[in-house]
Amino acid sequence: MLEIDALEIDALEIDGVCKRYGDVAACDQVSFQVRAGELFGFVGGNGAGKTTTMRVVLGVVAADAGEVRWAGAPLDHATRRRFGYLPEERGLYPRMRVLDQLVYLAELHGFGVNQAHRAAEDWIARLGLREHRDAEVQRLSLGNQQRVQLAAALVHDPEVLVLDEPFSGLDPLAVDVLAAVLRERAGAGVPVLFSSHQLDLVERLCDRVGIIQRGRMVACGTVDELRAGSGTTVVVHAPGAAPGWADGLAGTTVVGVHNGRVRLRLADGVDDQAVLAAALATGPVREFSHHRPSLVELYRDAVGDGS
């Protein structure tokens, strides 16, 4: 079971969630938490279990085992009504006008008609949809339909946001607008859980990241924590060295070679000065530096050859 700090009671907790479809374990003891005011990036390959986990959170599918809690209490229908959800399969009424659709959805979440209109107009303006407010959704571009879907997840001022690929189909300007909105919501204390294949964006935006592979969580933490767990990596440029000079160095693994620069991961306890000495033995060394792996590199290390 998850151990939740008393100061983090306002957290969305996914605790030991399991879900099988026949012989396939879509979720296998999935556990993590999204703290109040936190942007949590949920990443993994296609079919890794991201969407199933989110569906369990929202009650779209029932877990076979495990529990989801908000603020320490198991979720029920009334609690989930206060969540904002962007599903993988977008669900808009194609012939309804944008404004009418958002007002209707806000009212479904308990807003009065005037409050619903104000909220709908606000999100229409913030997401750049003013010129489309009276248009039918089916007449919008896919990118603008995505903006409407995002407005639908935000219009009722949700306590928790669960967004499945929210940046999919957005142009760069819209990505920046949404990123600012998510930061603002997190700044107001809302836990924000979202999935994305855009790992550079996740690294830039998120407080913490969870990596899922074949239904199991394989890594979770801040990017710096994931870096610390990946060990020390150095980059060496020894232009006079023969190809493969580093292949036999004890306690090291060659993880990349680019333009003569060799990237080496050092095992625990290996002194980087021993690596430098080995490089100097081949001739002049023009570069010797520690490498900070990107989230893309950390992701590849975490999932290996899997998906």
Locate each region found by the language model:
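A short, local hydrophobic-aromatic micro-motif
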Residues: 15, 64, 138, 253-255, ...
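ABC transporter nucleotide-binding domain
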Residues: 179-267
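Conserved N-terminal strand/loop that marks the beginning of ABC ATPase nucleotide-binding domains
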Residues: 1-17
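Structural motif
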Residues: 90, 250-253, 283
